[in-house]
Amino acid sequence: MNLLITNDDGISSAGIKALERVLGKSYNTYLIAPLKERSVTSMALTVFQGMRVERINDNHYIADGFPVDCVNIGLYAEIFPKIDFVISGINRGVNMGYDVHYSGTVGAAKHGALHGIPSLAVSSGRIDPEDGYEKEAELVLAFLEQYKSQIQSGEIWNLNFPPEVSGTGTISELVFTRLGRRRYSEKYEKKQIIEGVSEFQLNGSLLGHDEETGTDFEAYAQGKIPLTPIQLDLTEKNRLKELLTNR
């Protein structure tokens, strides 16, 4: 099976190196990643201008673009064989709840699904671990061995690892969840440049979430590994049915 590996943390990140190192033992891996940090870029795509791509060798490329650009090039620029599966990560920090709408990690997986390819987004609550995300990568390998046949064409699965990872190579702590409700409270710092022109710097979000059962947040807080199937179709089907019935 041919795996396309990308991320939004950039080519130098420990997470993508761990994925390639571990998954390469069992699969054909093809890596293309952004030249630099591209977090919080969702499904941004480079258009109206060219994009520089550097070939390291037949299996490794660097793109001066977004995560979605990397997937697009990997699928359609004829640099790799036919791709069977897209994996994005391992992200430095989790992507749960409504984070998935902003995440470049999830955005890359969504783009794979958009083109009919089963896709997995992987994130971790461990920040810069000494082992370089080796434990998470081993668990991704175990996950693929058990579940790859269940991920259908065009599906996206979102996997998040808690800070404490067993490292046993098993996925006994994996639970299937739904997305929770993330709450954001944005704060900007304003700096006046000249009269009438100011610079606004987002100083991070105060993040919270609703306490609900069955969500990725609940599983994560319990030290489990939440796995959430998500989809591209944003139609609110129940509401649509109601509108059609009552028209």
From Swiss-Prot:
Keyword match Metal-binding: yes
Alphabetically, the GO molecular function entries are:
3'-nucleotidase activity; 5'-nucleotidase activity; exopolyphosphatase activity; metal ion binding; nucleotide binding
Task: From the UniProt record, list the reaction(s) this protein catalyses.
Answer: a ribonucleoside 5'-phosphate + H2O = a ribonucleoside + phosphate
Family note: Belongs to the SurE nucleotidase family.
> Could you name the Gene Ontology cellular component terms for this entry?
cytoplasm
The protein's name is: 5'-nucleotidase SurE
Its required cofactor(s), as named, are:
a divalent metal cation
The gene designation is: surE
Origin species: Leptospira biflexa serovar Patoc (strain Patoc 1 / ATCC 23582 / Paris)
Q: Does the keyword Metal-binding apply?
A: yes
